Amino acid sequence: MSKLTIEQFIAAIKEMSMLELNDLVKAIETEFGVSAAAPVAAAAAPVAAEAPTEVTIKLVEAGTNKVGVIKLIREITGLGLMEAKTAAETAGSVIKEDVKTEEANEIKKKFDELGAKVQLV
């Protein structure tokens, strides 16, 4: 058997049908114990963005129950009456920072019940 050059080998592959190419791939896999499947690189896989474990609670709108919102802000933060009132009257006020997501969702639910809107950032 004479040795094929690379050019001859490529020319022979170009002339094969899809079925013949499939048979060739299977024969190579069997002969050499390899797989034609592309290896999956762990680093190349897209990394899913993890949900933040700690968030900041910002007041978007106090709503109509401003007294209830002020009381809730005082309860959550421990602020005095005037500081809590100022926070309730200022849109975008940071109510609490670095809060666990579960706790932040509970606090958000309390604000929602009062008709206020908060944002978890």
Swiss-Prot record:
Report the family membership: Belongs to the bacterial ribosomal protein bL12 family.
The answer to whether the entry has keyword Phosphoprotein is no
What job does this protein perform?
Forms part of the ribosomal stalk which helps the ribosome interact with GTP-bound translation factors. Is thus essential for accurate translation.
| CC terms in the record's Gene Ontology section | cytosolic large ribosomal subunit
- Is Ribonucleoprotein a UniProt keyword of this protein? yes
**By its UniProt entry, which InterPro entries does this protein fall under?**
Ribosomal_bL12, Ribosomal_bL12_C, Ribosomal_bL12_C/ClpS-like, Ribosomal_bL12_oligo, Ribosomal_bL12_oligo_N_sf
Gene, per the UniProt record: rplL
TM ranges = none
Q: Which GO terms describe its biological process?
A: translation
Spell out the subunit comment.
Homodimer. Part of the ribosomal stalk of the 50S ribosomal subunit. Forms a multimeric L10(L12)X complex, where L10 forms an elongated spine to which 2 to 4 L12 dimers bind in a sequential fashion. Binds GTP-bound translation factors.
Gene source species? Ureaplasma parvum serovar 3 (strain ATCC 700970)
The alphabetized UniProt keywords are:
Ribonucleoprotein, Ribosomal protein
Extract one GO molecular function annotation from the record. Answer: mRNA binding
The organism's lineage?
A: Bacteria, Bacillati, Mycoplasmatota, Mycoplasmoidales, Mycoplasmoidaceae
This protein is called what? Large ribosomal subunit protein bL12
